[in-house]
C-alpha cells in the first residue's frame, strides 16, 4: 500500500486491512467511486494514490465483496462500487472483531 511516506513500509499490510474495512463500510452505505474514496480516506489520515486504491477495489470485487458498474458522466465513465451480500456479511464480522480488539486495546490503558 503506497502511503506517501506517512506510515513505515513495515506497517503497510496492517493499514491495508483497515483501508479495506473503510471501503466495505462506505460501500455498504451506498455507491462509492475511486476518487471519492481517496478523499474520504484522506479525511481519516490515509494517503493513497489511485494506483494503490484501485487494486484494492478490484481485489474486493474479485473476492465477491463488491460489485461495480460503469456510469457515463459527460464524456467519461465513472466506475461505481456497491457492497454485495458477501460484503455486508464480511463487514458485520469485521465490526465484531474490531469491537473485540478495541475493547482489548482500551483495557491496557
What do the PLM-derived regions correspond to, one by one?
Residues 77-95:
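Basic, amphipathic "hinge/linker" alpha-helix immediately C-terminal to the N-terminal HTH DNA-binding motif
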Residues 11-52:
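N-terminal helix-turn-helix DNA-binding core of bacterial DNA-binding proteins
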Residues 70, 75-78, 99-102:
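Histidine- and aromatic-rich ligand-binding microenvironments
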Residues 63-74, 82:
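Beta-hairpin "wing" of winged helix-turn-helix
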Residues 1-12:
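Short, Lys/Arg-enriched N-terminal segment that forms or immediately precedes the first helix
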Residues 53-55, 59-60:
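Basic amphipathic alpha-helical segments that dock to polyanions
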Residues 91-109:
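Amphipathic alpha-helical dimerization/coiled-coil segments
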Amino acid at each position: 500500500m503506497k502511503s506517501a511516506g506517512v506510515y513505515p513500509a513495515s506497517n503497510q499490510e496492517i493499514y491495508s486491512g483497515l483501508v479495506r474495512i473503510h471501503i466495505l463500510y462506505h460501500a455498504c452505505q451506498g455507491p462509492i467511486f475511486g476518487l471519492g474514496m481517496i478523499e474520504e480516506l484522506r479525511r481519516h489520515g490515509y494517503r493513497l494514490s489511485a494506483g494503490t486504491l484501485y487494486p484494492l477495489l478490484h481485489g474486493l470485487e474479485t473476492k465477491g465483496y463488491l460489485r461495480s458498474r460503469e456510469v457515463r458522466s459527460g464524456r467519461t465513465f465513472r466506475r461505481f462500487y456497491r457492497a454485495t451480500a458477501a460484503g455486508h456479511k464480511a463487514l458485520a464480522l469485521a465490526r465484531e472483531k474490531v469491537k473485540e480488539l478495541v475493547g482489548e486495546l482500551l483495557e491496557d490503558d
